[in-house]
Amino acid sequence: MPLPVYRITIKDKDYEQLKSNIWSNHFVPAQLVSGGKRIPIRIRYRGGHTREYPKKSYEIRTSKYTYHFNAEYDDPSLIRNALSFQFFNSIHVPSPSTRHCVLNLNNENLGVYLNIEAVKTPFFRKRGIPVRSIIYAVNDNADFTDKRSSGKSSFSGYNLIKGSERDRVKLSNFVQQIHLKVGAELQQYLRKHLDIENYLRWLCGAVLTGNYDGFNQNYTLFEHGKNRTYRMIPWDYEGTWGRNCYGKLVDSDLVKIQGYNKLTEKILSFRPHRQRYKALLSGFLESVFTVRRQLPIVYKMHNAIADHVYKDPNHKWSDKVFDSEPDTIRKYIDQRRQDILNQLGNLD
């Protein structure tokens, strides 16, 4: 079945403005044609070091929605983000929906892209989740460390997407308080301000998929609108399932079972939370994190995009590497399962 094609047209002067500064976050006007409909949009480049790549990623905004068109340039399979978000959804951690597509800009075929749903207000409305604030972890300062002695703000590393100054102050205070409180007082504080079940499930997802960068950045933190606890949503899971964020093959044990960042450390310092985390991991090893469960999903995604990837003028990997990626992911799952089984005792 052919992938959907999104055709974007940008006026020459606007396109020149876009290309003149790849680091600018300024949007330029454009038109998007999909399914016979022409929609006015705004478009800009997105990403970090990937902006320097020949195949760039884009953020597109309509009057109502925001979409991320990821080039997946460093992932030879082009499916790791999609596979990861589907995995998170299967373990009941709300995650962006995705769809592979072909992007065409001013009649030039840019290749296969992954259209990723933005984690903004419509994301929560669609899922019936009341939300008070939405906060992106945008760099590795978002590691929940005590920053008071460094002179950095406790909000360093974060970007407030929805909310007010009060929400900025609240998160800063949360980061400070987890370092000021100890013992039973800390445990009570965490239970009051953090959805620990959600956090442990998110931790399982990050640890099982092997996303080394997902603990100190590349996540969304949101405050639930009713119970006022913080919850986690994954973001940018290209460096997973046996490869890092640059596409390099890595050992399956790159990410330790205890995960990383100071909040994880604080949570797992309490035995009841370790026991729950261990039970969740054990359950996922028996159910969703298996070759039997994941490989059909891998092959379905891989087969759906294969013909288009072979024609992608900007795919930097050979067809041979692309064709071997399902087996690379299979080997990772087998090895990662053994890693986790060997380390479960560390959670006692």
Task: Indicate residue ranges for each PLM-predicted region.
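Short, flexible loop/turn elements at secondary-structure junctions
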Residues: 12, 47, 64, 71-73, ...
